[in-house]
Amino acid sequence: MTLISAPRIGIAGITGRLGTLCAEEAGSALVGGLSRTADPQRNITTDPAALAKNCDVVIDVSHASTVPAHAAAFAQAGCAWVLGTTGLDQGAQDAVNAAAQHIPVLQAANFSPALTLFLELARQLGAGLPDYDAEILEVHHRQKLDAPSGTALAIGRAVAEGRGVSFEDVARTDQNGRRPDGAIGFASLRGGQIVGEHDLVLMAADEQITLSHRALDRRVFARGALLAARWLAGRPAGLYTMADALKR
């Protein structure tokens, strides 16, 4: 393994809100970006292969529909891939898993270091309080496309993992009817310009505990993405998480 101390960084989704912040944080390490509209003066292309050939690592904060094409292009180029896009269907996730056989891929629903530790606490709470009702509330800006958020689903998966059960068997996004024992419920709110709020509530008849995270500035995600990119470049092929990057 030969780590790269100053990797050349590309950004897929560079003209979006988070992509723009990632570009600012990357500074002189930025070599170009990927968007739906090319801008040669800014080294922005519409071709993922053209971007990847000039990069050591690409931070991908684009759209779920682009993931299969990006997976193929980045794997072919041998370019490390930091993937923060959420709302993937099974076909897109299969493409990510296949790419990780050839290149290092760090996949995260949320790049916040504090939220990464939140997930570990969620696992511990799930394991330690297996009979408590688990509910997850998430609030985001009105433009967000997926609900529940990828981060909320990651929290639910962490609780299920702590309890040693299949997330798919216990996730409850349909709120009609009596609450099943062992279910993990979700509630989503959309409005205004809220960056991101997540609460995990575990409830029993005589007590409850709430674990909360509030993102106050979207730049925390950009800084986390850059941390992940610099950690990932030069790693062996495989599928990594933000928790791996924080062990640096």
UniProtKB/Swiss-Prot annotation:
Binding site for (S)-2,3,4,5-tetrahydrodipicolinate: H141, G150, T151
InterPro entries given in the database record: DapB_C (IPR022663), DapB_N (IPR000846), DapB_N_CS (IPR022664), DHDPR_bac (IPR023940), NAD(P)-bd_dom_sf (IPR036291)
Main location as per UniProt: cytoplasm
GO MF terms, alphabetically ordered: 4-hydroxy-tetrahydrodipicolinate reductase; NAD binding; NADP binding; oxidoreductase activity, acting on CH or CH2 groups, NAD or NADP as acceptor
Active site positions, chain numbering: H140 (proton donor/acceptor), K144 (proton donor)
EC numbers: 1.17.1.8
Location relative to the cell: Cytoplasm
Residues at which NADP(+) binds: R36
One GO BP: diaminopimelate biosynthetic process
Protein name (database record): 4-hydroxy-tetrahydrodipicolinate reductase
Source species of the chain: Gluconobacter oxydans (strain 621H) (Gluconobacter suboxydans)
